């Protein structure tokens, strides 16, 4: 019995160390890409692997907590995080929803890419296989079950995958990755267009 307990303890310590090393490695890689722009292609699948939808657009991220997510096809939409609030704009219905950043990211580990707050990491387990990192939520009630980030040989983010708790998942493939995009200064500022309804949930 003592031998079994000892083996169990060793395995637990070893697995904890592996998690810590994987998390530290991922944190460092993300810190090294604190500013980047890219084009994204998204494919959404149901729990059985059937393709549901494709989308594409442009992504701009500046850590901490600033990003501009512009979907251009098949329908246009825009998500802007200014470091404090998140603005979700749907031009088709002429409505924008304003959320507190902490509320908007509650159910998505995407904040780990855009943010740098260590307190978020305690809610996730991290495993690593080469340049692929899988971030799994410890909270079984969250909408997002896991989040996978893949880096290329230049340590640029080449892809990330999001799996929902109910089995549906999305693949995001990044291209035209640029660590030195030229910023005009207003990329992370959202101004409500004239005639657009505001749904303020802050």
From Swiss-Prot:
InterPro entries: LolA/LolB/LppX, OM_lipoprot_carrier_LolA-like, OM_lipoprot_carrier_LolA_Pbac. It is found in: Periplasm. GO terms for cellular component: outer membrane-bounded periplasmic space. It comes from the Bacteria. Keywords: Chaperone, Periplasm, Protein transport, Signal, Transport. It holds the Pfam family LolA. GO terms for biological process: lipoprotein localization to outer membrane; lipoprotein transport. Residues 1-20 form the signal peptide. The keyword Iron does not apply. Monomer. PANTHER family: OUTER-MEMBRANE LIPOPROTEIN CARRIER PROTEIN. Participates in the translocation of lipoproteins from the inner membrane to the outer membrane. Only forms a complex with a lipoprotein if the residue after the N-terminal Cys is not an aspartate (The Asp acts as a targeting signal to indicate that the lipoprotein should stay in the inner membrane). Belongs to the LolA family. This is Outer-membrane lipoprotein carrier protein. It comes from Aeromonas salmonicida (strain A449). The gene is lolA.
């Amino acid at each position: 019995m003592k031998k079994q307990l000892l083996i169990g303890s060793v395995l637990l310590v070893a697995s904890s160390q592996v998690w810590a090393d994987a998390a530290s490695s991922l944190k460092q890689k993300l810190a090294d890409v604190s500013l980047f722009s890219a084009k994204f292609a998204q494919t959404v699948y149901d729990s059985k692997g059937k393709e549901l939808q494709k989308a594409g657009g442009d992504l701009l991220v500046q850590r901490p907590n600033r990003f501009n997510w512009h979907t251009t096809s098949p329908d246009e939409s825009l998500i802007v995080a200014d470091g404090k609030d998140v603005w979700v704009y749907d031009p088709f219905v002429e409505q924008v929803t304003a959320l507190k950043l902490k509320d908007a990211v509650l159910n998505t580990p995407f904040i780990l890419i855009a943010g740098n707050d260590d307190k978020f990491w305690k809610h996730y387990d991290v495993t690593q296989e080469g340049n692929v990192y899988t971030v799994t939520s410890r909270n079984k009630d969250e909408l997002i079950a896991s989040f996978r980030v893949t880096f290329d040989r230049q340590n640029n983010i080449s892809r990330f995958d999001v799996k929902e708790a109910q089995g549906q998942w999305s693949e995001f493939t990044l291209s035209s990755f640029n660590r030195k995009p030229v910023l005009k200064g207003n990329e992370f500022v959202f101004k409500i267009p004239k005639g657009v309804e505001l749904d303020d949930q802050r």
